[in-house]
């Protein structure tokens, strides 16, 4: 895939991209912020072999990824949920 990603990627393209790259930028609408956001993530939790997940929930494509820049919660968790992402780079 080239550097100029189309505005809306297909689910299989997103899944292949995140699995093939060490890090990526993922863009999606975040209900928490009521806006479109872009986050830097990785498909595998650092220093482990624990991988992210993809599921269809209530008809939506949901990707669970490790947010590299997120503030960890009290358990050290930085997994985040991207619903219907529009692109990854």
Which residues make up each language-model segment?
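Short, compact, well-ordered microdomains
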Residues: 60-89
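Acidic, low-complexity, intrinsically disordered interaction modules
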Residues: 35-57, 70-74
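Acidic, metal-coordinating catalytic cores used for nucleic-acid/nucleotide bond scission
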Residues: 32
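A short, Trp-centered hydrophobic/proline-enriched beta-strand micro-motif
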Residues: 20-29
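Intrinsically disordered, low-complexity regulatory regions enriched in Ser/Pro/Gly/Thr
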Residues: 17-18, 57
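Mixed-charge, Lys/Arg-rich low-complexity intrinsically disordered regions
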Residues: 2-16
């Amino acid at each position: 895939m080239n550097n100029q990603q189309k505005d809306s990627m297909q689910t299989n393209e997103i899944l292949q991209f995140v699995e093939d790259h060490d890090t990526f930028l993922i863009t999606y609408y975040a209900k928490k912020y009521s806006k479109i956001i872009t986050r830097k993530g990785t498909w595998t939790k650092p220093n482990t072999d624990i991988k992210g997940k993809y599921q269809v929930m209530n008809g939506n494509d949901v990707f669970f990824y490790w947010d590299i820049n997120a503030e960890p919660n009290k358990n050290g968790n930085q997994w985040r949920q991207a619903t219907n992402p529009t692109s990854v780079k």
